[in-house]
A protein has these predicted regions:
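General small-molecule cofactor/ligand-binding pocket signal
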Residues: 14-16, 89
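ADP-ribose/adenylate-binding Rossmann-like module
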Residues: 42, 51-72
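Short acidic/histidine-rich motifs immediately flanking catalytic phosphotransfer sites
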Residues: 11, 30-35, 56-57
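Rossmann-fold NAD(P)-binding glycine/threonine-rich loop
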Residues: 64-88
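Short, conserved SAM-binding/catalytic segment
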Residues: 3-13, 77
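Active-site-lining helix/loop region of Rossmann-like oxidoreductase modules
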Residues: 108-161
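Adenosine-phosphate binding glycine-rich loop
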Residues: 84-124
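Conserved Rossmann-fold cofactor-binding substructure of NAD(P)-dependent oxidoreductases
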Residues: 17-35, 39-45
Length: 161
């Protein structure tokens, strides 16, 4: 991360290594910055506490959270963000994120929209001969969590588990 941040000519971008489970170290790091881009997964585990700490340390916040579980809790921090005059934007990855923006763009081109569906086409995906990962990573943990966990659905005008 530091190497990536250092590749920008603008020295206002920094990358740090941090144990985000160490609340004091997290708060100390956030206190030195105006904004945080949280890429720390799995998000069902780390998104809410990092957002909460960022807002309490008066940081603007962006992430690529793609887990529904913390998203509901994170929305509850809206008032804290408003009180601190901070912006918090969650779900800026591929899906949610780019898929939402593409759907919005498509909707603006139509006279009327009843529903929008997004999806992934993985039919052309080819398995790797050898994994590029030497260990379990956040994406793997996220995938398993989403496959075996419960999912909230919207049926008959209400959310259900």
């Amino acid at each position: 991360m530091k190497e990536f941040a250092d590749s920008f000519e603008n020295n206002k971008i920094t990358g740090i290594g941090l144990d985000v489970l160490d609340k004091e170290a997290l708060r100390s790091a956030l206190a030195k910055h105006d904004a945080v881009l949280n890429l720390t997964g799995p998000f069902f585990k780390f998104a809410y506490p990092i957002l909460e700490a960022a807002l309490e340390e008066n940081c603007h916040y962006l992430d690529i959270c793609d887990d529904w579980e913390p998203t509901e809790k994170m929305f509850a921090l809206h008032e804290l963000a408003k009180e601190n005059n901070r912006t918090a934007i969650i779900g800026l990855g591929a899906s949610p994120g780019i898929t939402n923006l593409l759907a919005l763009k498509a909707m603006t081109e139509l006279d009327e929209v009843n529903k929008i569906y997004t999806g992934w086409d993985i039919s052309s995906a080819e398995p790797e001969e050898e994994s590029s990962q030497s260990d379990v990573n956040a994406a793997m943990v996220h995938g398993i969590e989403q496959m075996v966990g419960k999912v909230k659905v919207f049926i008959n005008n209400k959310f259900q588990m």
